[in-house]
Regions:
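Short, conserved secondary-structure segments in the cores of folded domains
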Residues: 1, 116-119, 186
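Single conserved hydrophobic/aromatic residue that forms the stacking wall/gate
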Residues: 1-7, 11-12
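C-terminal helical cap(s) of enzyme catalytic domains, especially alpha/beta-barrels
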Residues: 18-37
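Extended boundary segments
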Residues: 34-96, 131, 135-163
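Short, well-ordered loop/turn sites that connect or cap secondary structure elements
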Residues: 104, 120-124, 189-191
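Hydrophobic beta-strand signal
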Residues: 111, 129-131, 197
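Short, charged beta-turn/beta-strand-edge "cap" motif at the junction between a beta-strand
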Residues: 133-138, 198-206
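Glycine- and charge-enriched low-complexity intrinsically disordered segments
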Residues: 147, 155-204
């Protein structure tokens, strides 16, 4: 329903600046840097990109929109997770779905709002996950729906110092990780020696 100011021709529905400001307020209010102790962002080097066969991948649909540069962290090991970007970027194949993160294979770990981890397969409507931003802020968001389908996968392996990890994601250009210069990069364009943003913490618990 469009909301208009009395005596004004301006409708909130038609003002992207107002929506942007509103989302910024939500993000700032949700920043829990002084609350739950969560790991910070690091960089990792891609060591290999290989086919991962056919498997079940999970799209996590939130009850609110993501901003560019935001996503959730996921991976095959809880100590080394990669930042998966939300579907906020236009594509010639599908429309944007700014509430969605195509987070990868169902065995992957994700960080919840309370700092614990769950497998993607365990997530349910109403669960709270941690949303990470390239600017270092972290907020919570509620899951509205989980969409699991069989798709071809890519296994993207990486290392950061003594830590190694991998993430298995759908082989699709709309699935994006985030490069070390804070720009989204399609999973189908990632190559060996590229650098991506990850979260590293060997104290993660499940």
């Amino acid at each position: 329903i469009p909301l208009c100011l009395v005596g004004s021709e301006m409708c909130i529905r038609d003002s992207p600046d107002i929506w942007s400001a509103a989302r910024s307020i939500v993000r700032d209010n949700g920043d829990r840097s002084s609350g739950v102790d969560l790991p910070s962002l690091s960089h990792a080097r891609i060591t290999s990109v290989t086919e991962g066969g056919i498997g079940e991948r999970a799209c996590v649909d939130l009850t609110e929109r993501l901003l560019e540069g935001e996503g959730i962290v996921a991976g095959s090991t809880s100590s080394c997770l990669s930042l998966i970007h939300g579907e906020t970027i236009p594509s010639q194949y599908v429309p944007t779905r700014p509430f969605r993160i195509n987070a990868g294979a169902i065995h992957s770990y994700v960080i919840m709002g309370d700092g614990t981890t769950k497998y993607l397969s365990e997530l349910e409507s109403g669960d709270r996950v941690s949303v990470f931003s390239v600017d270092g802020s972290i907020r919570e968001a509620t899951i509205g729906r989980l969409k699991i389908e069989r798709r071809p996968l890519l296994k993207i392996s990486f290392e950061s110092g003594e830590f190694t990890g991998n993430v298995m994601v759908q082989q699709a250009e709309t699935v994006r990780l985030i490069s070390s210069d804070s720009k989204p990069i399609s999973a189908t364009d990632i190559s060996q020696d590229d650098e991506i943003i990850v979260v590293i913490d060997n104290s993660m618990r499940h």
